[in-house]
Amino acid sequence: MSKATGFIKEFRDFAVKGNAIDLAVGVIIGAAFGKIVDSLVKDVVMPLVNFILGGSVDFSNKFLVLSMPDGYTGPMTYADLTKAGANVLAWGNFITIIINFVLLAFVIFWMVKAIYSARRKEEAAPEAPAAPPEDVTVLREIRDLLKDKQGS
């Protein structure tokens, strides 16, 4: 067998193993779940923060202009400034990403905790003792009969 076919066989064995497939599924689900958390922050959490604070608190549009291009007279929005080449510190977007991360970590923590709790319950459930094999049962019956005969 050549080195190339050996490498291909080794790669196939690795790719078909459960761990590699589980990892791939986890990455795909994690990416989709990240989008859900991002939507949760943008569409649920931030509107609630705005409502509680009684104003429009949109962290994603908060930034600090560090330097402007010479002669710039356009709009002072983050998108326009960065497009024009301004040096902009987007601290609001960073805060939004931190909120996303904290929520994602919190939800994953609770999911892992629930999974471990379910596993512990499965492990803690005592298994019913297995019935003894038939030959052992017959030998016990013979023993009991012999004890009864000796006792009488």
From Swiss-Prot:
Gene3D superfamilies hit by this protein: Large-conductance mechanosensitive channel, MscL, domain 1 (1.10.1200.120)
Location within or outside the cell: Cell inner membrane
Stretches that traverse the bilayer: 21-41, 44-64, 92-112
Gene Ontology molecular function: any one: mechanosensitive monoatomic ion channel activity
NCBIfam families in alphabetical order: mscL, PRK00567.1-4, PRK13952.1
Identification of the protein by name: Large-conductance mechanosensitive channel
Functional description taken from the UniProt entry: Channel that opens in response to stretch forces in the membrane lipid bilayer. May participate in the regulation of osmotic pressure changes within the cell.
Sections of the chain in a coiled coil: none
Subunit text: Homopentamer.
GO annotations of cellular component type: plasma membrane
Entry keywords, A to Z: Cell inner membrane, Cell membrane, Ion channel, Ion transport, Membrane, Transmembrane, Transmembrane helix, Transport
Annotated family: Belongs to the MscL family.
Bilayer topology: Multi-pass membrane protein
InterPro entries: MS_channel, MSC/AndL, MscL_channel
